[in-house]
Each structure stands twice: as structure tokens, then as C-alpha cells.
Swiss-Prot record:
The lineage of its organism: Eukaryota, Metazoa, Chordata, Craniata, Vertebrata. One of its GO terms (molecular function) is phospholipid binding. Residues 13-283 form the F-BAR domain. The modification Phosphothreonine is found at T184. This is Protein kinase C and casein kinase substrate in neurons protein 1. The gene is PACSIN1. It is a peripheral membrane protein. Disulfide bonds: none annotated. GO terms for cellular component: axon terminus; cytoplasm; cytoplasmic vesicle membrane; cytosol; endosome; ruffle membrane. Belongs to the PACSIN family.
Length: 444
């Protein structure tokens, strides 16, 4: 009976979740340990984002490299080719910015949190943090006298409630005995004495209970003051963490927000300028002069037979090879590129590894001035297929799209003899075909 009564009387206190209850300060102490863990979580968060930025930067670089190669090998030409290529330049520059973002996240933001955490939390030899132990000891010291009084109060309350219970039980028995014929006067007197004794016990326990309760009330202000003092110290420590992490988050935002970067804005300003610089009419004129009616032509004319030059016809018929990359001089004396735009396959087909040959043919049905019969059965492309290895004597930067660029000491393959303008057709080790000045190289 007494056990069930105790449980019922203590139930309201057990459900109380107030900070002032004994032991409930532990949530405030735990917040210190949580702060250290949250610093670790933020560093992990930043580290993962930096990893994403690094991967994205590498993907942009790989994409730009691949498509720049595809564009160079593809059929696009002129100013639009340069505008298209500017997209790859944008990717390279944005890749650099994301690489810088990754570096800022790791070298600045993450290191800043790491250093602050090291200065704010001090590990103990026995485990845990010094700051946590100081808070725990402070709360325990402030709460100890009050907790002792509360223990006395619980005991006094328990005794008072038990006395009340016994009194009620004695009164009930005494009243019931008056209606029972079997109860003797002596027994009736004992029951009455029991009631009187229980009432005295109730009076004594009530007085003690009220006295202890009064003592608790007197110690409560001092208890609250001590607990408030320790709590405010914990609040100040937590405030430093909250303010610091807010500053770090603002730094992270600044590093992530490329829209506020002047370099980022400049990238797209330059990209727009490059795209707007594309001129369809210029490209059409260039194509007309290099692959259309604007090209120079050695029109057929009567030639006297010269017995001293038995291979004249064959040499004349080798000239059409220049359509793949030779340079011819027009009537005004200006060197014009005759590189055929159709010689390059489409951008996407290059990626599939397809090879595209020149579209024109020297078959007799399409070339009334050529043929193996007229050349004594020789193949005008044998010389191109074989080639001769040569070494550059000087640096040369191609001035036209059909010209090769190389450095002194580079080796390349010579694919034809020098023409009357002093140009040779060759192939770089990268596979690029084009023209170069014949006197800039020597045979290896």
C-alpha cells in the first residue's frame, strides 16, 4: 500500500522537465560537447563541397579539351569557329574559378574552423573537455545545498502523506466498529486510541514538512543565483561559437557566390564579345575565296611539246593536290589559302574515330586533264603517302588556317615538293596537314 502511494505522490515531480530540477542542468553541459561535434560536422560539410568543386572543375577542363579538339578537326570555319571555341575558353576559365573556390574552402574556411575549435576546446588526459568539466562542477556545486534540502523535503512530505493515510484508515475502522455487535468496549477503546495517535502523527509530520518547505524556500534565491551564474558562463561560451560559425558561413557564402566575383563577370563579358564578333558575311567571303568561285585556277592553255621535259604533263597534274592545303597566288599577288572546308569531318563524327578523305577525285571521268595514261602509269599521290622526315630550322607561326606552326627543332613529314611559290605541304606528328615555307626545314 505504501509503495503504490509513494509512486502516485512522486509522479508529478518525475515528469517535470524544468532546468531548476535536480540534474536537469546536464542539457546545458551537453551543449558544450555538441558544439565541438558541430565544428567537426561543418568541416566535413565544407570538405565534401570542396571535393564536388574539384570534380566539377576537372570535368569542365576535360570537356573543354575534348570539344576543342573536335572543333579543330570538324568542318566549322572562320569567325564562327572562333566564337564556338570561346565556349571552351569559358569552360577553362570557370574551371579555374571553381578550383580557386575549392582552395578557398579548404585552405581558408576549413582551417579557420579547425583552429578556432582547437583554441576553444581543450581535451583532458582522462577524456572529455576542460570546458565541459568546469560547467559540470559549477552546476553541481551550486545545486548541492538545494538538492540536499529537496531530499529532506521529499522525506518530510512522504512521512506526512503516510501519516494522513494511516489516520484515514484508523478513522474508518473506528467508525465501522460502532456498527458491529461483535466489537467489545475494550476493542472500541483501542481503535479510538489509534485514531488519536494517528492525528498526533499527522500534526507532527505536517509541522516538520512545513518547516522543511520553509527552509527550502529560504535557500531557493541563493540556489537560483548560483545556477544563473554558471548558466550565463555557458551562454557566453556558446555565444562565441554561434557568432564565429555565422562569420564562417558568410565567408563560405562569399567563396561560393561566383556572381559577386569580378573575374567571373569578366569571363562572360569576354565570351559575349567573342560570339558577337562572329560575322557571317566575312565567313562566306572567306569560303568563296578558298573553296568557291573566288579560287584561282590554272585554266588549260596550249603548250608546245618539249622533248627535254618528258614529265611536264605529270608535274602539271600534281597541282590539284594543293586543294588540300597549298597556297596559290592570285592575280593581285596575294597568297590565298585553298584549304577545303569539306576536308574536315563533322565534329561528332570525329569523336567516333571516323576518318574523312578529300572529297574531290582525280578519276579520269571527273578530271579531263588527268589520268594514269597521261602520266605514264604513275600515281600522283605516292609521294604524299610516303613522305620525307624533315626538321625545322626556325620557328614559324602559321598566318592562315591552312598553314602549319612549329618551333625550331620540331620534326614533321614532308608530303610534296616545293611549289613555284616556295611552299611545301607537310604533316605534323599530331596529324595536322598544312603548308610551310620550304626553306624553313632540312631533311633529317
Amino acid at each position: 500500500m505504501s509503495g503504490s502511494y509513494d509512486e502516485a505522490s512522486l509522479a508529478p515531480e518525475e515528469t517535470t522537465d524544468s532546468f531548476w530540477e535536480v540534474g536537469n542542468y546536464k542539457r546545458t553541459v551537453k551543449r558544450i560537447d555538441d558544439g565541438h561535434r558541430l565544428c567537426n560536422d561543418l568541416m566535413s560539410c565544407v570538405q565534401e563541397r570542396a571535393k564536388i568543386e574539384k570534380a566539377y572543375a576537372q570535368q569542365l577542363t576535360d570537356w573543354a579539351k575534348r570539344w576543342r579538339q573536335l572543333l579543330e578537326k570538324g568542318p566549322q570555319y572562320g569567325s564562327l569557329e572562333r566564337a564556338w571555341g570561346a565556349i571552351m575558353t569559358e569552360a577553362d576559365k570557370v574551371s579555374e574559378l571553381h578550383q580557386e573556390m575549392k582552395n578557398s574552402l579548404l585552405n581558408e574556411d576549413l582551417e579557420k574552423v579547425k583552429n578556432w575549435q582547437k583554441d576553444a576546446y581543450h581535451k583532458q588526459i582522462m577524456g572529455g573537455f576542460k570546458e565541459t568539466k568546469e560547467a559540470e562542477d559549477g552546476f553541481r556545486k551550486a545545486q548541492k545545498p538545494w538538492a540536499k534540502k529537496m531530499k529532506e523535503l521529499e522525506a518530510a512530505k512522504k512521512a506526512y502523506h503516510l501519516a494522513c493515510k494511516e489516520e484515514k484508515l484508523a478513522v474508518t475502522r473506528e467508525m465501522n466498529s460502532k456498527t458491529e455487535q461483535s466489537v467489545t468496549p475494550e476493542q472500541q477503546k483501542k481503535l479510538q486510541d489509534k485514531v488519536d495517535k494517528c492525528k498526533q502523527d499527522v500534526q507532527k509530520t505536517q509541522e516538520k514538512y512545513e518547516k522543511v518547505l520553509d527552509d527550502v524556500g529560504k535557500t531557493t534565491p541563493q540556489y537560483m543565483e548560483g545556477m544563473e551564474q554558471v548558466f550565463e558562463q555557458c551562454q557566453q561560451f556558446e555565444e562565441k561559437r554561434l557568432v564565429f560559425l555565422k562569420e564562417v558561413l558568410l565567408d563560405i557564402k562569399r567563396h561560393l557566390n561566383l556572381a559577386e566575383s569580378s573575374s567571373y563577370v569578366q569571363v562572360y563579358r569576354e565570351l559575349e564579345q567573342a560570339i558577337r564578333g562572329a560575322d557571317a558575311q566575312d565567313d562566306l567571303r572567306w569560303f568563296r575565296s578558298t573553296s568557291g568561285p573566288g579560287m584561282p585556277m590554272n585554266w588549260p592553255q596550249f603548250e608546245e611539246w618539249n622533248p627535254d621535259l618528258p614529265h611536264t604533263a605529270a608535274k602539271k597534274e600534281k597541282q590539284p593536290k594543293k586543294a588540300e592545303g597549298a597556297a596559290l597566288t592570285n592575280a593581285a599577288g596575294v597568297v590565298e589559302s585553298t584549304s577545303q572546308a569539306g576536308d574536315r569531318g563533322s565534329v561528332s563524327s570525329y569523336d567516333r574515330g571516323q576518318t574523312y578523305a578529300t572529297e574531290w577525285s582525280d578519276d579520269e571521268s571527273g578530271n579531263p586533264f588527268g589520268g594514269s595514261e597521261a602520266n605514264g602509269g604513275s600515281n600522283p599521290f605516292d609521294e604524299d603517302a610516303k613522305g620525307v622526315r624533315v626538321r625545322a630550322l626556325y620557328d614559324y607561326d602559321g598566318q592562315e588556317q591552312d598553314e602549319l606552326s612549329f618551333k625550331a627543332g620540331d620534326e614533321l613529314t614532308k608530303l610534296g615538293e616545293e611549289d613555284e611559290q616556295g611552299w611545301c605541304r607537310g604533316r605534323l606528328d599530331s596529324g595536322q596537314l598544312g603548308l610551310y615555307p620550304a626553306n624553313y626545314v632540312e631533311v633529317v
